[in-house]
């Protein structure tokens, strides 16, 4: 990447936000559902996951029309997970990034449905990438479903909930982080490799790199 990170983020984060809004605005859905979805999209955040998709492509000197759609797909999954994590049955948080959480504004039921809608929209986005080959679309859908499902983010959240009542060892903590946070971060980098149509060897190298990025993300 020839640009500094700060410049790259300033150039691309607004484009990500614009694409996210467009994807939701064009939906023919109940107004309160749309408001709930937009509310969480507007809640802030660094857009780390979609930026990783774009940064991987930038580092490989690849430009694709559908890159922002793929980048937004992973951000939709991330945002849906935050809505559900904040619910009373999970982490029971009233605030996120200084704003009332979705369920405190729209109620538990609509918050759940807004999260569900975002999850579905993420996969819908991956089917609308006209510049990609069907094999690329299928691989992206497979990887995102794995990263966000029982083997990834959802499974990590279950492990996290199970570990709340006891002390965890290093291996258990790593298992949680690899799934709950690392899986989507890894997908973001692997998605860039798929979009760039890298060979299996290069994809493997980026996958190993992505794994370490996911772990490093937990260091404070």
Model-derived features: positions:
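N-terminal amphipathic/basic leader segments beginning at the initiator methionine
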Residues: 1-24
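Mg2+-dependent prenyl diphosphate-binding active-site environment of isoprenoid biosynthetic enzymes
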Residues: 12-14, 24-220
